[in-house]
UniProtKB/Swiss-Prot annotation:
Residues 166-175, 222-242 have a biased composition (Low complexity). Residues 697-861 form the Helicase C-terminal domain. ATP-dependent RNA helicase involved spliceosome assembly and in nuclear splicing. Catalyzes an ATP-dependent conformational change of U2 snRNP. Bridges U1 and U2 snRNPs and enables stable U2 snRNP association with intron RNA. Residues 507-685 form the Helicase ATP-binding domain. Its EC number is 3.6.4.13. ATP binds at A520, K521, T522, G523, S524, G525, K526, T527. One of its GO terms (molecular function) is RNA helicase activity. This is Pre-mRNA-processing ATP-dependent RNA helicase PRP5. The gene is PRP5. InterPro entries: DEAD/DEAH_box_helicase_dom, Helicase_ATP-bd, Helicase_C-like, P-loop_NTPase, PRP5/DDX46/KHDC4_KH, RNA-helicase_DEAD-box_CS, RNA_helicase_DEAD_Q_motif. One of its GO terms (biological process) is mRNA splicing, via spliceosome. It comes from the Eukaryota.
């Protein structure tokens, strides 16, 4: 034979070996071959006696026919040929013909001329053949447990079934090589270790899925990585269901079921490659739930092919049945002890102890520990594992009730949509960084100033009044502030010549570390009064690092005010090297999250969006850990526009020793006590020119006129203004958004370029409106009171209150949009005779600013006072007092009504009206009021409950048909009989108690010497009748069950029906799509079948038609049905929540696509 031919033979045999090794990854014969010194790639001499004899001796050349060193290659090829012979000997299949026409076959089998078909078995190897090579014990043990599987063979190869081995223990064939006792002991140890591992993996997969696994893991080791080991196995043989058991075994999930909250109580285990790969990186697991000694490992089938492949990739031998695992401490390769195995050997007692302690605590406290765990403080953004555990507890508590109605699930989904709660922080448990907030060192000229001179300066500066002790003296120059030079340069470049009155008194107080309430008229420089001390405060601290929150926070009630503050601070932060972010609702939150992740020293925000960012991604976007300087601008409106609960949530999560600053142009008395709750550090109240006063530079005009004359008067005023001054700006206030848009249309028809500004417009439109208004492109803007706060527009000469403001503070802020920074302006207010209840507030504002009060207005106020005294009118509200909370409640009620209406449930008003009509009808007929309506409502709610029924599903449900009236009556009778059967145990208990009482009476009579023969006979008769009745009932139930089993072999012991017809389309699709159904079946072990068809709202199925869309859940175990129902409820809630969120983001869109 030539060397070229021999190499061809080797290449072919190597290819055949490659095919076999890919189809059976556990074929470790090559590694066993190398372990005995037969590696063909090592070029070294070997003793011929160490090899077993080959049947093809004509290939064993002992001489080197090639001179010049080629004999070494020839010996190398010979070794390869011998390896190929060994593999052919071990393989049960017949190899393909080689390039030279020879065919390899099973040793000892007769050669056949034709090819064997796939359905033909391979011939049995002879018992007395050539010495068999020693195979790897792992391979032998595998053959004893793994089911046979088809081998993917190359073309021309027809495999037969593998030879069966009679024993489940590793069999070492007789060979010419003797195995030492140490190696035999090692093989036996290895087999036992593999069997023990398989048993432990099966128990762990079953036990870890129980409901207590999460609580133990979170309580004992909340930060450790939870691992779940899933292995594919067959389900135990139980009563058949409507889904073929063999088909279920073929299903295999390749996804991670970590989000599944249902307990995997079934014995169906999943093979998860991702979870298996995690095992090799763990050195220690958290405390596990108790191991159930009742699990019978004999029912657990052998591992699947996929499990073999995963174990082979991990370097772990597949499990093998063996004896006890007492001494299982041998590793596969180097005999070192596996840390995981060592831990598993000692974990049983620890797990049992932990489980007993936890069960004892739960029974003693009744769940008090969970309440304490929820109330524990967690720093926002620092450790989110506890927060996730609390969310899981809440979700389990809400979804743990199997019998939830459809409206309950929808309410739960709506609740989750709005759920944006901040975790309450226990500040005593947090070690905050110390910070300095007292930077003010007055210069000599201020320090030497006497108290009388300081009071005189305050009086000259618009009559500054201060409430509080030890207030610093007012400053008169920018150089007195101690600001950085770069900051003073920006002040000089902006043209700020001297501090305004509020700045003169507020800045030294803030820089001394005091909390203040600053009240000053509009346009008096309040923004700079809190911005400049903030810059000095932030520069004194270390820079903000990634994943840290801001140092200073400014909260405003409106988006426009937040944008304006951000624009005013930009020249300063650029010069000082600081970063700031402006976040508000209406803008995409993704962009704002990106800005926050870049770190920001200062955040200007509206309260709602700030809470969104604090709760986004479990608090990982930003946090309040480093906040030491807090500003509430327009503080009175912060506690009035519905922000009070949101503001308090944020404030309660900021460190208590922070510095808090409140500013506003108006601050009513009723808001003072509410605001003082947030001031901690010796607060001061600084008021400039009165609490609610319009600036003296603003001319105030009030006109009393009817509604139909207001628009013509408006056109007259605009004509006079723009004839006199073309570049002037005009801001017109109305009370409603619709009124702003209507007035906009009327002015455009008259030829005036106008735009509207209110909360119903998109944020982009609002920003463009303000930009065009400031630039002069649009001279007139109609707006609601959303533009009354903080809007600063140059050349704004005229403000018109087209609709009168409803309280004095709103009037002051509206008028304050003009006359900014000492300029002149005009405010004209229209009031109708029907709005006389607002006349008193307007008069108070006019008198406070020493403006002229029209006689008509005074007469109107006097007339209203008389009506009020006579009880014919009601006084107007002050505009404050937390009306936003009521508005939130109204919004929630409206949302709930909309949901009930969408899903066919009447709202409370409709129910009340129906109940009233029903009561009237019953009053005529003599029926008790409210009886029928209550019964109808109760039956409707009970009909929507998801109840776990004992026994097989009704035939009408299985046949997918709606019952007729007579059939429903018979079904109701059967249900009543079932209810009576349920009540029988109680009756039996009563009879038993009566029987015991009679026996006691009998014994007492005997003790007194009475004749008890007749009484004893009566008692015996009663006892005999009771036993006969019990036996008859038992036999009847058995007969019914046998009869049903005979007619329907798929009948189960428990079933439940989940109606899904009334849920949104996405929710229905979520629970009925193929992947979800397969996952539910495998994770819960119950049979789930889709029944019925979809009916639109108001449509009911007729008798004989399919029922409404529903899911039929069946199983022989009640816990499996409960798990399936609970998981379906969770999916329905999540899908409905997603629908509600989508509708909230894109209201009014009904198509599949939205316009970006």
């Amino acid at each position: 034979m030539s060397g070229y031919d021999n190499r061809d033979d080797y290449r072919h045999s190597s290819s055949s070996s490659h095919h076999r090794s890919r189809n059976s990854k556990h074929d470790s014969s090559s590694s066993s071959y190398r372990s005995h010194g037969y590696a063909p790639t090592r070029r070294r001499s070997r003793s011929p006696s160490s090899y077993h004899s080959s049947s093809r001796s004509h290939r064993d050349h002992t001489t080197d026919p090639y001179p010049n060193g080629s004999g070494h290659d020839r010996r190398h090829d010979r070794d390869r040929n011998r390896e190929r012979d060994r593999r052919d000997h071990d393989s049960p299949i017949e190899a393909a013909p080689s390039p030279d026409g020879r065919r390899f076959h099973v040793e000892g089998a007769p050669r056949q001329g034709g090819r064997r078909r796939w359905d033909e078995g391979a011939p049995t190897p002879p018992t007395a053949a050539a010495p068999v090579h020693v195979s790897d014990p792992t391979r032998s043990s595998l053959n004893t447990q793994l089911p046979s599987r088809p081998i993917v063979a190359p073309p021309g190869m027809a495999p037969g079934p593998p030879p069966s081995l009679p024993s489940s223990t590793p069999i070492v064939p007789s060979t010419g090589i003797s195995i030492s006792p140490e190696e035999q002991a090692k093989l036996a140890k290895k087999a036992r270790l593999e069997a023990w591992r398989k048993e432990q993996a099966a128990k762990k997969a079953l036990e870890e899925a129980r409901q207590r696994a999460r609580s133990i893991a979170s309580a004992v080791a909340p930060s450790s990585q939870r691992t779940e080991s899933f292995s594919s196995s067959s389900t135990p043989q139980t009563a058949p269901t409507s889904i073929n058991a063999a088909g279920l075994r073929t299903l295999s999930l390749r996804t991670d079921p970590s989000r599944t909250t249902a307990q995997n109580r079934s014995r169906t285990m999943m093979d998860d490659a991702s979870e298996s790969s995690k095992r090799i990186h763990l050195s220690r697991l958290g405390d596990l739930p108790p191991l159930d000694p009742s699990i019978d490992t004999a029912h657990i089938a052998t591992t699947s092919v996929d499990a073999e492949d995963d174990d082979h990739q991990l370097g772990v031998a597949p499990p093998t049945q063996g004896s006890s695992a007492a001494a299982m401490d041998v590793d596969d390769d180097d005999e070192e002890e596996d840390p995981l195995d060592a831990f598993m050997l000692t974990v049983k007692s620890q797990v049992a102890q932990v489980n007993d302690d936890d069960r004892r605590k739960a029974s003693a406290s009744g769940g008090h520990e969970r309440t304490q765990a929820k109330s524990k403080a967690v720093v926002l953004g620092r450790d989110d594992s506890d927060g996730e555990a609390e969310d899981q507890y809440e979700e389990l508590d809400e979804l743990d009730r199997v019998g939830m109605a459809t409206e309950d699930l929808l309410a739960l989904a709506a609740k989750k949509v709005k759920k944006k709660d901040l975790v309450t922080v226990d500040h005593s448990a947090i070690d905050y960084e110390p910070f300095n907030k007292a930077f003010y060192h007055p210069p000599a000229e201020i320090q030497d100033m006497s108290e009388e001179l300081a009071n005189q300066i305050r009086l000259e500066m618009d009559a500054i009044t201060v409430r509080g002790r030890d207030c610093p003296k007012p400053l008169t120059k920018w150089s007195h502030c101690g600001l950085p030079a770069s900051c003073l340069d920006v002040i000089k470049r902006l043209g700020y010549s001297a501090p305004t009155p509020i700045q003169s008194q507020a800045m030294p107080a803030i820089m001394s570390g005091r909390d203040i309430i600053g009240v000053a008229k509009t346009g008096s420089g309040k923004t700079m009064a809190f911005l400049l001390p903030m810059f000095r405060h932030i520069k004194d601290q270390r820079p903000v690092e990634p994943s840290e929150g801001p140092v200073g926070i400014i909260m405003t009630p409106t988006r426009e005010l937040a944008v304006q503050i951000y624009r005013e601070m930009r020249p300063f932060i650029k010069a000082l090297g600081l970063r700031a972010a402006c976040v508000y609702g209406g803008a995409p939150i993704s962009e704002q999250i990106a800005e926050m992740k870049k770190t920001a020293d200062i955040v200007v925000a509206t309260p709602g969006r700030l809470i969104d960012l604090l709760t986004a991604n479990s608090g990982r976007v930003t946090n309040l850990y480093r906040v030491t300087y807090l500003v509430l601008d327009e503080a009175d409106r912060m506690f009035d526009m519905g922000f009070e609960p949101q503001v308090m949530k944020i404030l309660n999560n900021i460190r208590p020793d922070r510095q808090t600053v409140l500013f506003s142009a108006t601050f009513p008395k009723q808001m003072e006590s509410l605001a003082r709750k947030v001031l901690k550090n010796k607060p001061l109240e600084i008021t400039v020119g009165g609490r609610s006063v319009v600036a003296a530079e603003i001319e105030q005009i009030v006109e009393v006129r009817s509604e139909d004359t207001k628009f013509h008067r408006l056109l007259e005023i605009l004509g006079e203004l723009y004839n006199r001054e073309k570049d002037a700006r005009t801001l017109i206030f109305v009370d409603r958004q619709e009124a702003a848009d209507d007035l906009l249309k009327d002015l455009i028809r008259k030829g005036y370029v106008t735009m509207s500004l209110h909360g119903g417009k998109d944020q982009v439109d609002r920003d463009e409106t303000i930009s065009d208004f400031k630039a002069g492109n649009v001279p007139i803007v109609t707006a609601t009171s959303v533009a009354a706060r903080g809007l600063d527009v140059k050349q704004l000469k005229l403000v018109i209150n087209y609709d009168v403001p409803n309280h004095m503070e709103d009037y002051v802020h509206r008028a304050g949009r003009t006359g900014r920074a000492g300029q002149k302006g005009t405010c004209i207010t229209f009031i109708t005779p029907e709005q006389d209840r607002y006349a008193r507030d307007i008069i108070a504002a006019l008198k406070a600013s020493a403006a002229h009060v029209p006689p008509e207005l005074e007469a109107m106020a006097a007339s209203f006072k008389e009506k009020l005294a006579a009880g014919k009118a009601k006084a107007a509200g002050s505009g404050f007092g937390g009306k936003g909370l009521d508005r939130f409640e109204l919004d929630r009620e409206k949302t709930l009504k909309a949901q009930k209406s969408a899903y066919g449930e009447a709202d409370d008003d409709a129910k009340a009206a129906a109940a009233g009509d029903s009561s009237e009808d019953k009053a005529k007929t003599g029926a008790p009021p409210g009886a029928s309506s209550s019964e109808d409502q109760l039956s409707k709610i009970q009909g929507m409950k998801i109840e776990i029924m004992q026994g097989a599903a009704p035939e009408s449900v299985r046949d997918n048909k709606t019952l007729s009236a007579s059939q429903e009556a018979s079904a109701a009778a059967a249900a009543a009989a079932a209810a009576r059967s349920k009540a029988e145990p109680e009756q039996e208990l009563k009879e038993a108690a009566q029987l015991k009482a009679q026996e006691a009476a009998l014994e007492a009579a005997k003790a007194h010497g009475a004749d008890t023969t007749k009484l004893a006979a009566v008692l015996e008769n009663i006892r005999r009748q009771a036993n006969a009745r019990k036996e008859a009932a038992k036999n009847s139930e058995l007969d019914k069950h046998k009869d049903r089993k005979a007619r329907d072999p798929d009948a189960t012991d428990y079933h439940a029906i989940v109606p899904i017809n009334d849920f949104p389309q996405r929710a229905r699709w979520r629970v009925t799509n193929k992947e979800t159904m397969r996952h539910l079946i495998e994770s819960t072990g119950a049979s789930i079948t889709n029944k019925g068809v979809f009916y639109k709202e108001g449509t009911e199925p007729q008798p004989g038609e399919p029922p409404k869309l529903q899911l039929l859940i069946e199983s022989n175990t009640k816990s499996m049905v409960e798990d399936a129902v609970r998981e379906i409820q969770r999916l329905l809630v999540e899908a409905t929540q997603a629908v509600l969120e989508a509708e909230a983001r894109n209201p009014g869109t009904t198509g599949r696509y939205t316009v970006v």
